[in-house]
């Protein structure tokens, strides 16, 4: 062994004594090089994300205009984590979470940890405490724009508080980023959009809370309504576009189109109809759809109703589509094979706190 290697080994041993085992290692020695994920609750979005779902131990931003479906997308992620036996927390800074709607989306509201903070500092401190515990699998903050700094709440209505929220988010994310990675928690921040004044060229839209969240996010999703869905004259939902505008774990800029039905969330049946026809699992002739050589209905909405009434056929088609797309296990398979993380790996060493 050369003198250089001996010197390096000595330095590494000293660092491990000071900061704990694993403080420095070769990248090739890591056992978690493959990105571990949780399904988003949508086959199309799982495919657009490139790795089969939301990456664990990463920060994710979901932003878009009002009533575009941002909270719905986040609640579906919570439902998937809970279905696999995970623990979820929701920081409701907007004080607007509808428990009945969350339940309709599949969220176990009896076991969802909820906080409605009085100000931004309190909300982010609670989020950090949840993450540092190592016992929470997913945490959602709704929304960044509603994380009002304490000084602004206690001040007068017309007072100027330039850059306070951006400073708050920057400080919080510096503390959160390492904890999120070590605890393998998925941290989802929902954000609104604002318009910059005086922009003549390019997109005038921006997100509140400064630039820090843009930098620290591994995945950024832009959610926008595309068109209304009707049954006769009644509007029953929206066709929604979800664009992956930033992705550190797969190629970005892919777009997922989903049906978000009022009171029910993302329509799994709608995705199965569209993707089934695209990947030729379902055969389409004019307005008629066939499966395994047998006609099952005419028109997209009628096929969605048929699949709702025949869950065995729906699940069978779902699995064939996932196999054709190369996207992870189906929802039922995922529930049966929850990956257990040893407690000693999840909890932080007291010496590091």
Swiss-Prot record:
Keywords, in A-Z order: ATP-binding, Cytoplasm, DNA damage, DNA recombination, DNA repair, DNA-binding, Nucleotide-binding, SOS response
Region ranges (Disordered): 331-353
GO molecular function per UniProt: ATP binding; ATP hydrolysis activity; ATP-dependent DNA damage sensor activity; damaged DNA binding; single-stranded DNA binding
InterPro entries documented for this protein: AAA+_ATPase, DNA_recomb/repair_RecA, DNA_recomb/repair_RecA_CS, P-loop_NTPase, RecA-like_C, RecA-like_N, RecA_ATP-bd, RecA_C_sf
Record carries keyword Secreted: no
Entries under CDD domains matching the protein: RecA
Localization annotation: Cytoplasm
Record-linked Pfam families: RecA, RecA_C
Residues engaged in binding ATP: 64-71
Regions of compositional bias (Basic and acidic residues) in chain numbering: 335-346
Signal peptide: none
One biological process term in Gene Ontology: DNA repair
PANTHER family: MITOCHONDRIAL DNA REPAIR PROTEIN RECA HOMOLOG-RELATED, RECA
Family per similarity comment: Belongs to the RecA family.
Function in brief: Can catalyze the hydrolysis of ATP in the presence of single-stranded DNA, the ATP-dependent uptake of single-stranded DNA by duplex DNA, and the ATP-dependent hybridization of homologous single-stranded DNAs. It interacts with LexA causing its activation and leading to its autocatalytic cleavage.
This protein's name: Protein RecA
């Amino acid at each position: 062994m050369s003198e250089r290697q001996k010197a390096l080994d000595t330095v590494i041993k000293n660092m491990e004594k000071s900061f704990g085992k694993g403080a420095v290692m070769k990248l090739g020695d890591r056992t978690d090089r493959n990105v571990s994920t949780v399904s988003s609750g949508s086959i199309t979005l799982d495919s657009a994300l490139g790795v089969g779902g939301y990456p664990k131990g990463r920060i994710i931003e979901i932003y878009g205009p009002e009533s575009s479906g941002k909270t719905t997308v986040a609640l579906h992620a919570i439902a998937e984590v809970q279905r696999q036996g995970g623990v979820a927390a929701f920081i409701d800074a907007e004080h607007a979470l509808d428990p009945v709607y969350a339940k309709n989306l599949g969220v176990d509201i009896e076991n969802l940890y909820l906080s409605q903070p009085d100000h931004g500092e309190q909300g982010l401190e609670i989020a950090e405490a949840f993450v540092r515990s190592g016992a929470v699998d997913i945490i959602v903050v709704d929304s960044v724009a509603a994380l009002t700094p304490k000084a602004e709440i206690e001040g007068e209505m017309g007072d100027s508080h330039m850059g306070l929220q951006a400073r708050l988010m920057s400080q919080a994310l510096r503390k959160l980023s390492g904890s999120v990675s070590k605890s393998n928690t998925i941290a989802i921040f929902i954000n609104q959009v604002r318009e910059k004044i005086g922009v003549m060229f390019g997109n005038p839209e921006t997100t509140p809370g400064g630039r820090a969240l843009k930098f620290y996010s591994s995945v950024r999703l832009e959610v926008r309504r595309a068109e209304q869905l009707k049954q006769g004259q009644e509007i029953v939902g929206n066709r929604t576009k979800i664009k992956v505008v930033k992705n550190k774990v797969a190629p970005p800029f892919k777009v997922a189109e989903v049906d978000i039905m009022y009171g029910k969330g993302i329509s799994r049946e709608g995705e199965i109809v569209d993707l089934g026809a695209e990947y030729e699992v379902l055969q389409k002739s004019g307005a008629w759809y066939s499966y395994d050589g047998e006609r099952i209905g005419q028109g997209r909405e009628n096929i969605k109703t048929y699949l709702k009434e025949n869950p065995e056929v729906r699940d069978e088609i779902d699995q064939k589509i996932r196999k054709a797309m190369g996207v992870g296990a189906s929802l039922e398979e995922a529930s049966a094979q929850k990956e257990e993380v040893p407690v000693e790996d999840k909890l932080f060493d007291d010496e590091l706190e």
